[in-house]
Amino acid sequence: MTVEQSSPTTLRRLSARLALIRDDTDDDKLSAGFLLVATILALVWANIGDSYESFWHTPVTIQISDNSISLDLKHWVNDGLMTLFFFVVGLEVKRELTIGELTDRARAAVPLLAAIAGLALPAVLFLILNPSGDEATAWGVVVSTDTAFVLGALALVGPRCPARLRVFILTLAVADDIGALALIAFFYTDDLRLGPLLLGCVGLLLIIQLRKLEVWRGVAYFIVAAGTWVAFYESGVHPTLVGVLIALILPVYPPRRSEVERAGELTRAFRQSPNSDYARAAQLGVLRAVSVNERLLRFYQPYTAFLVVPIFALANAGVVITGQTLADAARSPLAWGIVLGLVVGKLVGITAATALFSKLRPGSLPPGLTLSQIAGGSALAGIGFTISLFIVDLAIDSPELANEARVGVLTAAVIATVLGWALFRLSDTVHPPTEVVGLTLLRPVDPGRDHLRGPADAPLTLVEYGDFECPFCSKATGSIRDVRAHFGDELRYVFRHLPLDDVHPHARFAAQASEAAAAQGRFWEMHDHLFANSDALAEDEIFGYAAELGLDMDRFEEDIRRGTYVHRIDDDELDAESSDFRGTPTFYLGATGTDLARHSGPYDAATLIRKLEEARGADGAP
C-alpha cells in the first residue's frame, strides 16, 4: 500500500477547518466530546469480537536500506503520533512560562502549590495500596490531569460563572503537565544507550541552528525532527519527549512593533506590484512578525484536540468488559489504588493546599473564587485519562494488570465527574447564586493595586470600568472631572479596564499602553491623553502620546510587546464577566469601606453627585 504525503496546502486547509470548528463552538465541550465519543467507540469495539486487538496489534515496519523500525499500530500511535500531542503541550508550557499565566509568580503561586500537592498526594495514596511488585511501578498513572476532559466537564457541570475557576484550573493543569512530562523523562526510561542519545542531542542542536539561520521551511525541521525521534527511540528514552524538547527550544514572544511595521510595508509593496518575489517577501514578513511558537500552536492544536487524542483514546481505552474483568478489577489493589489516588488524592491534595495557602496569605485567592468551587474543580482534576492511559502503557507489561489499570482510570473519571457535579451543587445550596449578580463591587478597591485619583482614605469611592475607545466613556470624563471638583479630597476615583474588542479594535492596545505608562508613574497622564484622543488610538498615535509624555520608549515598547501587565486587564475583565455586565462605562459608588453599589441610569455629574451624597448620608459619614 502506498501512502502519498499530503501537500502543505491540504494540511493548512484541514487545520483551518478544524480551527473554524473550534472557534465557532465551545471548544472545551467539543474537544471533550470528541474524546468521549472515541472512548465509547473503543469500549464498544473491544467488546464485539477480536478485531479490536488484532487491528491495533497489526505490525507496521518502516525500512530505509538495512535499517528499520517495526511497531504495531498501537505503539505507532503511542510513541509516534503522541509526539505531536506532547509537542503541543510543550508549546503551551513554554508560552505560559514566557508570556502567560506563569510569568506572574505571585498570581500563579496558589495553583502551582495546589498542583504540587495534587501530584504528590495521589502517588502516596496509590503506593499505600501498592507498595511493591509490578503494580508499584504504575504510581505515575495517578499524577496527571486530562485538561481537555476537565475543562469540558467544568463547562457542563461547573458553577454559573466559572471564569476565575477556569483560569485557576488551566494554570494548575500547565504545572501538572510539567510534572507529568518530567515524570515520564526520569522514571519511565529503560535501558539507556548513550550513543543514540548523543545523536538525538545533536539533532536538537541542529534544530537550534536552523532557527538561528532563520530557516523557515517546515520540511527541513521535519527531517531533522524525524531523525531525532529515531535517535531517542533507539536510546531508550521515550521518543515522545522529543516533541516536548523541540517545543521548548522554539522561541515565543509578543509581536515586535518593528517587524509588524515591516510586514505592513512588504504587504503594501506586493499590493502595488504583485509578483512572486514580493509575495514571498510579504509572506515571510508576516510569519516573522509572529513567534513560531504561536504559529505552530495555532496550526497543530486542532489536530491534537480533534484527531490525535481521540485516536489515542480509540487505541488505548478499549477494555473487554465481562463479569470476570469487573470482578478482577474490584479485587485489584492496582485498580483501587488508581481510583483512590485520582479521586481522593486530587480532591484532598489540591483543596487542602489551596486552603492552607489562602489561610497563610489572606487575599491570595482571586475575588469571587470560593474554596467550595475549588473543591469541585479539584474533584474534576481526578479525570486523568489521556496521560494516565499513556503511562499505563509505559509502566505495565502484563495485559491483565493493564486491563485492571484501565478499568481504574475509566472508573475514576466517572466518579470524579459525578463528585465534581455534587460538590458544585452543594456549593450552590450553601451559597445560593443570586438571580441578579454584580449589584455590588466584586473585588474591593486595593490602593496598592488599583489606579486611584484622590486620597486612598477618602470617605467616598467612585469606580469606573471603562474603554479608552468608547465615546461614552470619553464623554463621561467631563462628568468625572466635575464630580471630583465637587467633592475634592472626600472622593477617590478608581479606573479599571473593560476593552470591548468587538466594537473598539484599538481599546485593548490602549489599555496595555496605559499600564505600561503606569509602570513609569504616568498612568493618569496617559489616561487623559487617550480619552482626549479616543478617535485616534492607532499604535503609532499611542506611541506618539507616550513620547510626548517623555516616557522611556524602549521600556514602554518592551512592556507592551511582552504583555507584562496584561494580567491586570484580564483581572478587570473577569470582574465584568463574573458580575454579568458588558457595557461601558459601568460605575460602582458608595461610602468607602462599604459594599459599593452598581450605578444604573444617567451618569451626568449631577446624578453621580446626588448618588454619592445619598451614600454618604446612608453611611452616616460627615
UniProtKB/Swiss-Prot annotation:
Residue ranges constituting the Thioredoxin domain according to the UniProt record: 430-617
Compartments, as annotated in UniProt: Cell membrane
Pfam families, sorted: Na_H_antiport_1, Thioredoxin_4
The Swiss-Prot or TrEMBL record describes its family as follows: In the N-terminal section; belongs to the NhaA Na(+)/H(+) (TC 2.A.33) antiporter family.
PANTHER family attached here? NA(+)_H(+) ANTIPORTER NHAA, SODIUM ION/PROTON ANTIPORTER NHAA-RELATED
Q: What does this protein do?
A: Na(+)/H(+) antiporter that extrudes sodium in exchange for external protons.
Q: What is this protein called?
A: Na(+)/H(+) antiporter NhaA 1
Query: What does UniProt list as this organism's lineage?
Result: Bacteria, Bacillati, Actinomycetota, Actinomycetes, Mycobacteriales
